[in-house]
């Protein structure tokens, strides 16, 4: 018998399994759930012995691991719970140093929702000329605010600080630059955290489903208000690149040049899957409470984890190999299940920094809008039909236009992991691989055949892979566009992945400036 076996047998027998008492899950009503009740309930679960007791050192062959990462999350929940007894823990996401456009005219949304009124937060740089034809509309990514560059009212550097200003990419000596917070956001524009004027309560998940096109229509209401008939250019990166293309398709006569950086003409399965995973993690946080958390503890743990997942898609493996490698934060200590490798501490920091800087419901709604994005003609025609039907209901006096019901749709047979004939490489090949863009997408992008379009992709981008930008360019060419420009930055130029559009002033900024001039 092995000596180790003898030692192992000398230890006490393990504890008998503890039978957990079932507890009832209360579905939150429209009213916000009581914060103190939910917090006290979680404490009671820990104190009533419903969980297995940690074995004492003399009963165990090894000491129990410590979990400072979980301790920190529990401490944050306790702090937010204490704050909620006062004015509420939900942070103010914006400092208010922006301009605000308010529309009293209802906005019909693509999936039948209706906003009786809405606000769009925006900031501007440069001077609007007399003809009002020097306007560049800058579109943001998913979680960005209108603060793309510092202003006199808000000197804090913006998310595109180095790209905007005199002599820079968006030259404010020439152009009047407008950047908005998108509809559905939480930085001053109407979104789930906004009060519904119909009943004086925050929308929460009563907010209607959005599309990228809905966001663009709201932006053009702002342009109408400012008296801007036609944009000199529509510029955007990531989700903003999707908006930039959508602006040209929806309003071809009102858009001049188009710039789409690290975007796509339709969302693809990998990107949808990654955003779905983020939403699932967030929605599984008990504090999310089906969206009605505004008078309680915000789902900071779910937001933190969702951001960590997102950060994995924003940068690239090669960059992290060079930056972090396999280094541990403290090699002198024994490995832990909490963040230990440098890459783990980086992700932990990214999640912690973001978890209270953005509204959870806004993340859910806007990321879903990205998933729904498809500029193919079939989807455009279906949307047109939906809007006509919704408008007919409104005209007939129907109060509720959209159907908020939902069912969990699962396949009748389990998914097969082995490839089938319908998923062959030939059938799933992209436009860049086959040299032929899908006819449906070619027809959908036909309104852009006479526009000057710049498409930029990054080889190290895993969220919006470079083949998706090649698909845009090749689709436009087949649609009859003879002036489209396509640039792909290789790994020898940038290893920053999807975030390259935020960091590479020389290559991204230089290409955009040359195109605009």
From Swiss-Prot:
Q: Which residues form the active site?
A: 238, 461, 498
Compositional bias of kind Polar residues:
36-64
Q: What does the UniProt keyword field contain? A: Acyltransferase, Amino-acid biosynthesis, Cysteine biosynthesis, Mitochondrion, Transferase, Transit peptide
Ranges where the record places region Important for substrate specificity: 141-144
Q: Name one GO molecular function term.
A: serine O-acetyltransferase activity
Which SUPFAM superfamilies does the protein's record reference? alpha/beta-Hydrolases
Describe the family membership recorded for this protein in Swiss-Prot or TrEMBL: Belongs to the AB hydrolase superfamily. MetX family.
What's this chain's function? Answer: Transfers a succinyl group from succinyl-CoA to L-serine, forming succinyl-L-serine. Also has weak serine acetyl transferase activity and homoserine succinyl transferase activity.
Q: What is this protein called?
A: Serine O-succinyltransferase
Q: Which organism is it from?
A: Emericella nidulans (strain FGSC A4 / ATCC 38163 / CBS 112.46 / NRRL 194 / M139)
**Gene transcribed to yield this protein:** cysA
């Amino acid at each position: 018998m092995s000596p180790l076996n003898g030692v192992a047998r000398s230890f006490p027998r393990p504890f008998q399994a503890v039978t957990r008492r079932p507890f009832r899950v209360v579905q939150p009503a429209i009213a916000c759930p009581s914060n103190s009740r939910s917090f006290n309930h979680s404490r009671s679960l820990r104190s009533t012995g419903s969980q297995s007791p940690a074995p004492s050192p003399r009963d165990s062959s090894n000491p129990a691991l410590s979990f400072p990462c979980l301790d920190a999350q529990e401490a944050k929940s306790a702090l937010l719970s204490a704050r909620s007894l006062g004015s509420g823990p939900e942070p103010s996401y914006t400092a208010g140093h922006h301009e605000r456009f308010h529309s009293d005219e209802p906005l019909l949304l693509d999936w039948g929702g209706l906003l009786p009124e809405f606000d769009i937060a925006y900031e501007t740089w440069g001077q609007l000329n007399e003809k009002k034809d020097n306007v560049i509309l800058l579109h943001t990514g998913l979680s960005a605010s209108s603060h793309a560059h510092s202003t006199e009212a808000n000197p804090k550097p913006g998310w595109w600080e180095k790209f905007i200003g005199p002599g820079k990419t968006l030259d404010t000596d020439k152009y009047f630059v407008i950047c908005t917070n998108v509809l559905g956001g939480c930085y001053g524009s109407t979104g789930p955290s906004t009060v519904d004027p119909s009943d004086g309560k925050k929308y929460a998940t009563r907010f209607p489903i959005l599309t990228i096109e809905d966001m663009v229509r709201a932006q053009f209401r702002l342009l109408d208000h400012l008296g801007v008939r036609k944009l000199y250019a529509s510029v955007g990166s990531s989700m903003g690149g999707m908006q930039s293309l959508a602006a040209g398709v929806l309003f071809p006569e009102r858009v001049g040049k188009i710039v789409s950086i690290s975007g796509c003409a339709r969302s693809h399965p990998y990107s949808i899957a990654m955003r779905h995973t983020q939403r699932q993690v967030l929605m599984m946080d008990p504090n999310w409470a089906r969206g009605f958390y505004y008078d309680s503890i915000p789902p900071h743990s779910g937001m933190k984890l969702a951001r960590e997942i997102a950060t994995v898609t924003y940068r690239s493996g090669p960059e992290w190999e060079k930056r972090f490698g396999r280094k541990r934060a403290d090699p002198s200590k024994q490995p832990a299940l909490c963040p230990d490798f440098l890459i783990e501490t980086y992700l932990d920091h990214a999640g912690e920094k973001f978890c209270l800087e953005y509204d959870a419901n806004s993340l859910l709604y806007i990321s879903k809008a990205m998933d729904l994005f498809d500029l193919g003609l079939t989807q455009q025609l279906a949307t047109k039909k939906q809007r006509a039907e919704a408008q007919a209901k409104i005209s007939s006096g129907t109060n509720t236009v959209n159907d908020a019901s939902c069912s969990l749709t699962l396949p009748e047979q389990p998914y097969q992991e082995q490839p089938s004939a319908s998923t062959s490489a030939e059938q799933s090949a992209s436009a860049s691989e086959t040299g032929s863009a899908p006819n449906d997408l070619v027809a959908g992008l036909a309104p852009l055949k006479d526009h000057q379009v710049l498409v930029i992709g990054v080889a190290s981008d895993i969220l919006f892979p470079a083949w998706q930008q090649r698909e845009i360019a090749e689709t436009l060419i087949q649609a009859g566009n003879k002036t489209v420009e396509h640039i792909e930055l290789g790994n020898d130029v940038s290893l920053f992945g999807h975030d390259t559009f935020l960091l590479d002033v020389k290559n991204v900024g230089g290409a955009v400036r040359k195109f605009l001039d």
